[in-house]
Amino acid sequence: MKILISNDDGFQAPGIVALHDALKDIADVEVVAPEHNNSAKSNALTLAAPLYVHKAHNGFRYVTGTPADCVHIALKGLLGYRPDLVVSGINNGANMGDDTIYSGTVGAAMEAYLFGIPAIAFSQIEKGWAHVDAAAQVARRLVQQIERERMLDGGAFLLNVNVPNRPLQELKPIQVCRLGRRHSAEKVITQESPRGETMYWIAGAGGAKDSGEGTDFHATAAGHIALTPLQIDLTDHANLGQWRETVARLGN
Protein backbone atom coordinates (compact mmCIF):
# COMPACT_ATOMS: atom_id res chain seq x y z
CA MET A 1 0.00 0.00 0.00
CA LYS A 2 1.30 3.43 -0.97
CA ILE A 3 0.10 6.47 0.98
CA LEU A 4 0.61 10.17 0.30
CA ILE A 5 0.41 12.36 3.41
CA SER A 6 -0.26 16.09 3.40
CA ASN A 7 -1.79 18.70 5.72
CA ASP A 8 -2.47 22.42 6.09
CA ASP A 9 -0.45 23.16 9.25
CA GLY A 10 2.89 22.80 7.47
CA PHE A 11 5.47 20.06 7.14
CA GLN A 12 6.92 20.64 10.62
CA ALA A 13 3.60 20.40 12.48
CA PRO A 14 3.36 17.75 15.22
CA GLY A 15 0.21 16.36 13.62
CA ILE A 16 1.81 15.35 10.33
CA VAL A 17 4.87 13.97 12.09
CA ALA A 18 2.67 11.80 14.34
CA LEU A 19 0.60 10.67 11.36
CA HIS A 20 3.70 9.72 9.38
CA ASP A 21 5.17 7.80 12.31
CA ALA A 22 1.91 5.89 12.84
CA LEU A 23 1.63 4.83 9.19
CA LYS A 24 5.23 4.33 8.09
CA ASP A 25 5.43 0.67 9.12
CA ILE A 26 2.14 -0.39 7.51
CA ALA A 27 2.63 1.31 4.14
CA ASP A 28 5.09 3.06 1.87
CA VAL A 29 4.50 6.67 2.85
CA GLU A 30 5.51 9.93 1.22
CA VAL A 31 4.99 13.37 2.76
CA VAL A 32 4.34 16.40 0.55
CA ALA A 33 3.07 19.30 2.65
CA PRO A 34 3.04 23.11 2.70
CA GLU A 35 6.12 24.98 3.82
CA HIS A 36 4.06 27.16 6.17
CA ASN A 37 0.68 27.07 7.87
CA ASN A 38 -2.09 27.24 5.27
CA SER A 39 -5.19 26.90 7.42
CA ALA A 40 -8.52 27.89 5.83
CA LYS A 41 -7.13 27.69 2.29
CA SER A 42 -9.81 25.17 1.28
CA ASN A 43 -9.20 23.89 -2.28
CA ALA A 44 -7.18 26.91 -3.43
CA LEU A 45 -4.59 26.34 -6.16
CA THR A 46 -1.75 28.74 -6.93
CA LEU A 47 -2.09 29.71 -10.59
CA ALA A 48 -0.34 33.08 -10.87
CA ALA A 49 3.06 32.16 -9.42
CA PRO A 50 5.54 29.28 -9.68
CA LEU A 51 5.74 26.68 -6.93
CA TYR A 52 8.94 25.27 -5.47
CA VAL A 53 9.50 21.92 -3.79
CA HIS A 54 12.20 21.38 -1.16
CA LYS A 55 13.26 18.36 0.88
CA ALA A 56 13.65 18.49 4.67
CA HIS A 57 16.28 16.59 6.65
CA ASN A 58 13.70 13.94 7.60
CA GLY A 59 12.76 13.24 4.00
CA PHE A 60 9.51 15.22 4.02
CA ARG A 61 9.01 17.33 0.92
CA TYR A 62 7.50 20.77 1.34
CA VAL A 63 5.94 23.10 -1.18
CA THR A 64 5.71 26.89 -1.34
CA GLY A 65 1.97 26.65 -1.84
CA THR A 66 -1.38 25.52 -0.50
CA PRO A 67 -2.47 22.07 0.69
CA ALA A 68 -4.28 21.45 -2.60
CA ASP A 69 -1.14 22.57 -4.47
CA CYS A 70 0.85 19.93 -2.60
CA VAL A 71 -1.48 17.09 -3.50
CA HIS A 72 -1.92 18.32 -7.07
CA ILE A 73 1.83 18.54 -7.68
CA ALA A 74 2.43 15.18 -6.02
CA LEU A 75 -0.21 13.37 -8.06
CA LYS A 76 0.46 15.09 -11.38
CA GLY A 77 4.22 14.76 -11.64
CA LEU A 78 6.24 14.80 -8.43
CA LEU A 79 5.68 11.25 -7.18
CA GLY A 80 5.80 9.42 -10.48
CA TYR A 81 3.25 6.88 -9.28
CA ARG A 82 -0.37 6.76 -8.17
CA PRO A 83 -0.81 6.28 -4.41
CA ASP A 84 -3.48 3.94 -3.11
CA LEU A 85 -4.61 6.44 -0.47
CA VAL A 86 -4.11 10.09 0.44
CA VAL A 87 -4.27 11.03 4.12
CA SER A 88 -4.39 14.65 5.30
CA GLY A 89 -3.70 15.92 8.81
CA ILE A 90 -3.65 15.58 11.66
CA ASN A 91 -5.14 19.07 11.88
CA ASN A 92 -4.61 21.32 14.89
CA GLY A 93 -8.30 21.90 15.63
CA ALA A 94 -11.71 20.70 14.55
CA ASN A 95 -12.98 20.44 11.00
CA MET A 96 -16.65 19.83 11.70
CA GLY A 97 -19.82 21.20 10.16
CA ASP A 98 -19.20 24.32 8.07
CA ASP A 99 -15.46 24.09 8.81
CA THR A 100 -15.15 21.59 5.99
CA ILE A 101 -15.89 24.31 3.41
CA TYR A 102 -12.87 26.35 4.51
CA SER A 103 -10.52 23.62 5.69
CA GLY A 104 -7.18 23.20 3.99
CA THR A 105 -6.93 19.77 5.59
CA VAL A 106 -10.15 18.69 3.90
CA GLY A 107 -9.10 20.56 0.75
CA ALA A 108 -5.94 18.45 0.44
CA ALA A 109 -7.97 15.25 0.77
CA MET A 110 -10.59 16.55 -1.64
CA GLU A 111 -7.94 17.25 -4.28
CA ALA A 112 -7.02 13.56 -4.22
CA TYR A 113 -10.69 12.58 -4.38
CA LEU A 114 -11.11 14.75 -7.48
CA PHE A 115 -8.40 12.64 -9.10
CA GLY A 116 -10.24 9.45 -8.19
CA ILE A 117 -8.06 8.47 -5.24
CA PRO A 118 -9.50 7.49 -1.83
CA ALA A 119 -8.73 10.14 0.77
CA ILE A 120 -9.17 10.80 4.49
CA ALA A 121 -8.85 14.05 6.45
CA PHE A 122 -8.00 13.72 10.15
CA SER A 123 -8.40 16.48 12.75
CA GLN A 124 -8.29 16.87 16.51
CA ILE A 125 -11.24 18.82 17.86
CA GLU A 126 -9.15 21.10 20.09
CA LYS A 127 -5.99 23.03 19.32
CA GLY A 128 -2.72 22.39 21.10
CA TRP A 129 -1.82 18.85 20.00
CA ALA A 130 -2.77 17.19 23.29
CA HIS A 131 -2.86 13.40 22.77
CA VAL A 132 -1.94 13.75 19.10
CA ASP A 133 -0.33 10.30 19.20
CA ALA A 134 -3.71 8.84 20.15
CA ALA A 135 -5.29 10.50 17.12
CA ALA A 136 -2.49 9.07 14.98
CA GLN A 137 -3.27 5.58 16.28
CA VAL A 138 -6.93 6.13 15.35
CA ALA A 139 -5.76 6.96 11.83
CA ARG A 140 -3.56 3.86 11.72
CA ARG A 141 -6.37 1.55 12.84
CA LEU A 142 -8.87 3.01 10.38
CA VAL A 143 -6.42 2.74 7.48
CA GLN A 144 -5.66 -0.87 8.41
CA GLN A 145 -9.37 -1.71 8.54
CA ILE A 146 -9.98 -0.07 5.18
CA GLU A 147 -7.13 -2.09 3.67
CA ARG A 148 -8.34 -5.35 5.26
CA GLU A 149 -11.78 -4.86 3.75
CA ARG A 150 -10.20 -4.05 0.37
CA MET A 151 -12.08 -0.76 0.21
CA LEU A 152 -9.17 0.84 -1.64
CA ASP A 153 -10.07 -1.33 -4.62
CA GLY A 154 -13.66 -0.11 -4.82
CA GLY A 155 -13.24 3.41 -6.15
CA ALA A 156 -12.63 6.78 -4.56
CA PHE A 157 -14.15 7.90 -1.26
CA LEU A 158 -13.67 11.01 0.88
CA LEU A 159 -13.84 10.77 4.67
CA ASN A 160 -13.68 13.51 7.30
CA VAL A 161 -12.59 12.25 10.72
CA ASN A 162 -12.54 14.31 13.94
CA VAL A 163 -10.90 12.91 17.06
CA PRO A 164 -11.38 14.24 20.61
CA ASN A 165 -8.16 15.17 22.42
CA ARG A 166 -8.16 12.21 24.78
CA PRO A 167 -5.85 9.33 25.62
CA LEU A 168 -6.41 6.37 23.31
CA GLN A 169 -8.06 4.26 26.01
CA GLU A 170 -10.56 7.04 26.77
CA LEU A 171 -11.74 7.51 23.19
CA LYS A 172 -15.18 6.12 22.46
CA PRO A 173 -15.86 4.13 19.27
CA ILE A 174 -16.21 5.75 15.87
CA GLN A 175 -19.66 7.07 15.01
CA VAL A 176 -20.59 7.59 11.38
CA CYS A 177 -22.50 10.87 11.29
CA ARG A 178 -23.50 13.87 9.20
CA LEU A 179 -22.01 17.32 9.34
CA GLY A 180 -23.56 19.72 11.82
CA ARG A 181 -23.77 23.49 11.31
CA ARG A 182 -22.17 26.47 13.00
CA HIS A 183 -23.56 29.89 13.79
CA SER A 184 -22.17 32.66 11.60
CA ALA A 185 -18.63 33.79 12.35
CA GLU A 186 -17.89 36.35 15.02
CA LYS A 187 -17.52 40.04 14.14
CA VAL A 188 -14.25 40.99 12.46
CA ILE A 189 -11.57 42.48 14.70
CA THR A 190 -10.39 45.98 13.80
CA GLN A 191 -7.13 47.64 14.81
CA GLU A 192 -5.27 50.76 13.78
CA SER A 193 -1.95 50.30 12.01
CA PRO A 194 1.12 52.43 12.87
CA ARG A 195 0.25 54.48 9.77
CA GLY A 196 -3.24 55.18 11.02
CA GLU A 197 -4.98 52.79 8.65
CA THR A 198 -7.71 50.42 9.78
CA MET A 199 -6.70 46.75 9.80
CA TYR A 200 -9.21 43.91 9.75
CA TRP A 201 -8.71 40.45 11.21
CA ILE A 202 -11.05 37.55 10.51
CA ALA A 203 -12.50 36.48 13.85
CA GLY A 204 -13.22 33.00 15.15
CA ALA A 205 -15.81 30.59 13.83
CA GLY A 206 -19.25 30.60 15.36
CA GLY A 207 -20.32 28.03 17.90
CA ALA A 208 -22.29 24.92 17.09
CA LYS A 209 -25.80 25.64 15.79
CA ASP A 210 -26.97 22.23 14.58
CA SER A 211 -25.34 19.88 17.06
CA GLY A 212 -28.09 17.36 17.66
CA GLU A 213 -27.81 13.61 17.74
CA GLY A 214 -26.36 12.23 14.55
CA THR A 215 -24.01 15.18 13.93
CA ASP A 216 -20.25 15.32 14.21
CA PHE A 217 -20.57 17.95 16.96
CA HIS A 218 -22.76 15.65 19.05
CA ALA A 219 -20.51 12.63 18.58
CA THR A 220 -17.27 14.35 19.56
CA ALA A 221 -18.88 16.14 22.52
CA ALA A 222 -19.72 12.70 23.88
CA GLY A 223 -16.15 11.51 23.40
CA HIS A 224 -16.71 9.57 20.19
CA ILE A 225 -14.59 9.77 17.07
CA ALA A 226 -16.74 11.29 14.30
CA LEU A 227 -16.49 9.96 10.74
CA THR A 228 -18.40 11.72 7.97
CA PRO A 229 -18.37 10.56 4.33
CA LEU A 230 -18.21 13.63 2.07
CA GLN A 231 -19.05 14.26 -1.58
CA ILE A 232 -18.28 16.93 -4.16
CA ASP A 233 -21.75 17.43 -5.63
CA LEU A 234 -23.07 20.78 -4.36
CA THR A 235 -26.30 20.57 -6.36
CA ASP A 236 -29.48 21.35 -4.41
CA HIS A 237 -31.33 18.37 -5.87
CA ALA A 238 -34.45 18.92 -3.75
CA ASN A 239 -35.08 22.30 -5.38
CA LEU A 240 -34.19 21.58 -9.00
CA GLY A 241 -37.87 21.27 -9.91
CA GLN A 242 -38.81 24.54 -8.23
CA TRP A 243 -36.09 26.44 -10.09
CA ARG A 244 -37.05 24.85 -13.40
CA GLU A 245 -40.60 26.14 -12.89
CA THR A 246 -39.35 29.61 -11.92
CA VAL A 247 -37.09 29.84 -14.95
CA ALA A 248 -39.84 28.54 -17.24
CA ARG A 249 -42.09 31.42 -16.16
CA LEU A 250 -39.44 33.87 -17.32
CA GLY A 251 -40.16 32.85 -20.89
CA ASN A 252 -37.71 33.64 -23.65
From Swiss-Prot:
Top EC group: hydrolase
Cofactor(s) annotated in UniProt: a divalent metal cation
Cofactor note: Binds 1 divalent metal cation per subunit.
E.C. number(s) listed in UniProt: 3.1.3.5
Chief location category: cytoplasm
Function: Nucleotidase that shows phosphatase activity on nucleoside 5'-monophosphates.
Protein's name according to its UniProt entry: 5'-nucleotidase SurE
Organism, scientific name: Variovorax paradoxus (strain S110)
Gene that this sequence comes from: surE
